[in-house]
């Protein structure tokens, strides 16, 4: 733990090197065999295995997801846009306020600047894959749309009804809600079989977990495609219901 590390460093600073190293080794050994450490190691391997094998999940062949739409350009929406564009996807971010779009763009520019391993041309190409818009039309043909608007079921129903007709033929509509039941939100959808919950954690660029929530009518193909999408953007997808 951080407390033990600090204590060990402080105590070791007053000792000769051999005794300080012995003190450090004893402290490390005590932490390494503690119940907390064992639980963290077990959880790490569980998540890694789940991400690689997806045991128990449907084997339906997932159709490609190449173009995604994101509704809402806040921190969540901008984060989703960046991680998706970083994996080569075409992204459209739609918001009702230009100020929000400008903030989302600035967020992605700042994230791109942190990628020191990328050349300037590669950063420019990444950012160019993201379209920022006040209009609905650029969302046409999206294979997946994720709404990240306010936690209000009426607002979510409205954007579902506005955007669903623009989806690709087999397009999926997903909600990033953290509180509203997916089956309830799916009532606003025309095709409930392709309505699903994709709950990301903020900041999206750093948090690895992706919770997938199925509605009562969500089909296996939709689930399989969303699992594939989650793995593509580097997340650990877990079906929570």
Which residue stretches match the model-derived regions?
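Rossmann-like NAD(P)-binding element
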Residues: 96-100, 113-184, 188
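Intrinsically disordered, low-complexity segments enriched in small/flexible residues
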Residues: 1-64
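Generic, well-ordered alpha-helical scaffold segments in large soluble proteins
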Residues: 8, 31, 79, 83, ...
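NAD(P)+-binding Rossmann beta1-loop-alpha1 motif at the extreme N-terminus of oxidoreductases
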Residues: 52-111, 131, 215, 219
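Internal alpha-helical scaffold of NAD(P)-dependent oxidoreductase catalytic cores
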Residues: 212-241
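Short beta-alpha connecting loops at secondary-structure transitions
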Residues: 91-96, 147, 207-215, 239-241
């Amino acid at each position: 733990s951080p407390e033990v590390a600090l204590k060990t460093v402080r105590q070791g600073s007053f000792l000769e090197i051999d005794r300080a190293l012995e003190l450090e080794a004893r402290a490390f050994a005590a932490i390494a065999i503690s119940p907390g450490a064992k639980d963290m190691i077990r959880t790490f391997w569980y998540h890694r295995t789940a991400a690689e094998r997806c045991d128990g999940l449907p084997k339906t062949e997932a159709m490609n997801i190449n173009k995604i739409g994101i509704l809402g350009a806040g921190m969540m929406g901008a984060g989703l846009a960046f991680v998706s564009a970083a994996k080569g996807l075409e992204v459209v971010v739609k918001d009702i306020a230009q100020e929000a779009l400008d903030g989302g763009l600035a967020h992605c520019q700042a994230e791109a600047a942190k990628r020191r391993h990328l050349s300037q041309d590669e950063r420019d190409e990444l950012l160019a894959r993201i379209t920022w818009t006040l209009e609905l039309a650029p969302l046409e043909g999206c294979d997946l749309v994720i709404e990240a608007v306010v936690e209000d079921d009426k607002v979510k129903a409205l954007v579902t009804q506005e955007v669903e007709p623009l989806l690709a033929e087999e397009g999926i509509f997903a909600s990033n809600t953290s509180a509203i039941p997916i089956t309830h939100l799916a009532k606003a959808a025309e095709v409930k079989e392709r309505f699903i919950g994709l709950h990301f954690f903020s900041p999206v660029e750093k948090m690895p977990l992706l919770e997938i929530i199925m509605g009562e009518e969500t089909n296996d193909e939709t689930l399989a495609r969303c699992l594939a999408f989650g793995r593509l953007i580097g997340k650990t997808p877990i079906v929570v219901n």
